[in-house]
Amino acid sequence: TRCSRDWSSDVCSSDLVFTEILQSGMSDEECFIVHRGKECFVIMNAFPYSSGHILVLPYREVSDVEALTPSEHAELFALVTTGIQVLKTEFKPQGINVGINLGAVAGGSVAQHLHVHVVPRWGGDTNFMVTVAMTKILPEALDVTAARVRARWAQMGGAR
């Protein structure tokens, strides 16, 4: 399983994509993991809506918020909060979306592994190109963005 810069569409379309990434044996840098906690981790979205789009999720595959243990729940939302602070500090967005898509009909593309989207937003960042031509225009490469997020996270006290 590859999870490096050329994110395979086969891997990314897998229902087990996050578990496959964790079990790939590749470095966090190659897999765009920016922080590891005790029960949850933070990874860059391979198909970001905007620069800095992160996903926060438990290591354990669960599909619903109510399936989280109390400690997973606490850490997940603590990491969401830290992620918001990291993105605000590093990218200076005008707003942030935080969301969970529970189930395929709700928009969940990896519905069996709960993950929280934390998306920096700016006025006019409609990303209309995605719907027109399946093209993503971002100001920097994903590995550069991941390095920025990782460094800022460590600087803000979230050492790995």
How would you label these PLM feature ranges?
Residues 1-11:
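Single conserved hydrophobic/aromatic residue that forms the stacking wall/gate
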Residues 16, 42, 58, 76, ...:
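Divalent metal-coordination and catalytic microenvironments
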Residues 29-62:
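A glycine-rich, hydrophobic loop/mini-helix early in the fold
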Residues 55-77, 133-138:
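Short histidine-centered catalytic/ligand-binding loop motif
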Residues 91-104:
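A short glycine-rich, hydrophobically flanked beta-strand micro-motif that places a catalytic Asp/Glu
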